[in-house]
Amino acid sequence: MDAQAQTAIKHYAEMQSAPRFPLHLPVEMKSQSGTCSAETQNISANGVLFAMDRDVPVGSLVEFTILLPGDVVGSRRDVQIDCHGRVVRSFEDQGRRGVGVVIDEYHFERV
């Protein structure tokens, strides 16, 4: 196994250690191959697991916006999180794709 693969595995293991919160929200994900609909399955400080109908290859750069309802974040207004990240995991489960994304950059905005 080369050094790059070992680094990726170590980073993924660290990402997995962050607490995950089950949250199912609709999202539009943009990648080089186009835009597709997805649904968050869980969210952590490091990333998001999405359920979707198509594959997004590991290593793909993606952009997506998560709209958190105000009651979830203890606010009167919803909070929008604009995210840039990369796919670190892709698998199939019961006919749907699971896609794990590490968030590299994000921006919060009240809407």
Where in this protein do the model-derived segments appear?
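Structured alpha-helical
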Residues: 1-111
